[in-house]
Structure formats: C-alpha cells, structure tokens
C-alpha cells in the first residue's frame, strides 16, 4: 500500500517516469496539382441595334362596334392603332372609346387624342411623347406645312 502512495506523490510532483507513448502522426502527402490552361471560351455577344422589322401602324375608321375586338387584337400584337371616330354616332363613339380605353389600360398601353374624334392607341412597346395636339397645332400635319 505504501508503494501506491509514493507513486501518487511522484506523479503529483512530476517525478514519475512514464514510458514514452508512441503518438501516431498523420502523414501529410503533398499532391502536386497539374495546372491545365483553360481556354477562355467566352464569345462576344453582339446584338444588332438596328432591326430589320418595321413597325406597322394600323388605321381604323369603324362603322359598327363589331370592329372593336379587331382593334384590340392589333394592340395585343403590339401594333399601334390610329382610330377615327368622327363619322359615327356620338353614343357609339363613346362606347368604342370606353372599350378601347379599357383595353389600353389592361395592356399597359397609352392613348393620345389627336383631334376631336381621332386617337392614337399605342401598346406598351411604343412610347408617345409630348402633346401631339399641340405639336399638330404648331407644326401642321406635315413638316412642310406651317
């Protein structure tokens, strides 16, 4: 028993000799990566600004309300429409205007009054800038007219 107490005191004081324990070391292996040159395969993406498609403007002078869906179909196909409502009854003209104004709103388009019964209806891909009525009043319909 006395041997155990002495061993404990030696361990406590740090005088006890331990057998060297073998510590397993992890082997580090260096792997050389082969550098392979990568070819830059990016190609320049060139987009032609000038497109060959021409925008068509559709003119309508309706005589009855059955033509209204055809006008809206042109707007859905992203074609601007000029509509002349001067030669139809005022009630029918109001009905046309209300229907087309709702279609323009639904298609996120634009409507501009040219004269008392003539309107330009443009889909969302066509911008109408300025006040056309004022420009027509100042410049005339054709540039050479004043």
Swiss-Prot record:
The record's subcellular location field reads: Cytoplasm
Provide this UniProt record's keywords sorted from A to Z.
Cell cycle, Cell division, Cytoplasm, Septation
Q: Name one GO biological process term.
A: FtsZ-dependent cytokinesis
User: Known Pfam families for this protein?
Assistant: SepF
Task: Name the GO cellular-component terms.
Answer: cytoplasm
Query: What functional role does this protein have?
Result: Cell division protein that is part of the divisome complex and is recruited early to the Z-ring. Probably stimulates Z-ring formation, perhaps through the cross-linking of FtsZ protofilaments. Its function overlaps with FtsA.
Q: How does it assemble?
A: Homodimer. Interacts with FtsZ.
Tell me its family.
Belongs to the SepF family.
What this protein is called in its record is: Cell division protein SepF
